[in-house]
Curated annotation (Swiss-Prot):
Belongs to the globin family. This is Hemoglobin subunit mu. One of its GO terms (cellular component) is hemoglobin complex. Keywords: Heme, Iron, Metal-binding, Oxygen transport, Transport. Signal peptide: none annotated. Heme b binds at H58, H87. PROSITE patterns: GLOBIN (PS01033). GO terms for molecular function: heme binding; metal ion binding; oxygen binding; oxygen carrier activity. Expressed in erythroid tissues. The lineage of its organism: Eukaryota, Metazoa, Chordata, Craniata, Vertebrata. One of its GO terms (biological process) is cellular oxidant detoxification. It comes from Homo sapiens (Human). It holds the Pfam family Globin. The gene is HBM. Residues 1-141 form the Globin domain.
Amino acid sequence: MLSAQERAQIAQVWDLIAGHEAQFGAELLLRLFTVYPSTKVYFPHLSACQDATQLLSHGQRMLAAVGAAVQHVDNLRAALSPLADLHALVLRVDPANFPLLIQCFHVVLASHLQDEFTVQMQAAWDKFLTGVAVVLTEKYR
């Protein structure tokens, strides 16, 4: 459960990301593929070039899902249920990859926001993204 202050910090950071989802998402994916090359197996169709159209498109979709989670922080299950079904039942993404993605997301945020991304904001985002990952992995059996 997120405190009112944590929710405000998440919304504050999201306001800085909004409108740049494709760029943040593409950078997140590139960092994930670079640091954890085994994750590329789920994205064989994506080029490892930050301005690649498909990479930007998938980055946009990923961060749109994060944005939906930010908007529905009180009901993540309902907001993310279709995405959870997709990852667990169709794509069969190894749930061990979600913490790797979270780690890379923190680095992308910190690299862009620098001093604005305080320890408290990082903690709030970690708690929030961990909650998102929990919801996304609930459908695994």
